[in-house]
């Protein structure tokens, strides 16, 4: 989790206070992960132990889309195939082309561009 987060922060240069969503996974127990968040003024956010899907609806929705639109459509034989499939889905489709009703039917990249240029 830390390597892609470092890459995202380096490329996107988020404003201080950006909330990073998690599900209380192993990354939240990692001192390196927590230190990276702190050093970059990022705020950890994760669901409670007895969470409902509403607590982290955006992340739950993303995972549902990833499964339906990508993973269930392919037979993955190894880690490299899985990594490539997921990377391409996120970078080439989900962020750049897939429209989202929650952001005025824009793709995440188009929405971010609109916000930055406002």
Tell where the protein language model's regions lie, with residue ranges.
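Charged DNA-binding/catalytic regions of mobile-element recombinases
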Residues: 1-118
């Amino acid at each position: 989790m830390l390597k892609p987060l470092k890459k995202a922060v380096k490329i996107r240069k988020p404003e201080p206070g950006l909330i990073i969503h998690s599900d209380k996974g192993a990354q939240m127990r990692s001192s390196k992960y927590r230190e990276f968040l702190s050093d970059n003024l990022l705020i950890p956010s994760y669901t409670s132990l007895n969470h409902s899907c509403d607590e982290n609806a955006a992340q739950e929705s993303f995972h549902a889309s990833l499964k339906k639109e990508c993973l269930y459509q392919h037979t993955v034989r190894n880690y490299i195939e899985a990594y490539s499939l997921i990377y391409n889905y996120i970078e080439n489709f989900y962020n750049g082309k897939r429209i989202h009703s929650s952001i005025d039917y824009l793709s995440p990249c188009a929405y971010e561009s609109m916000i930055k240029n406002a």
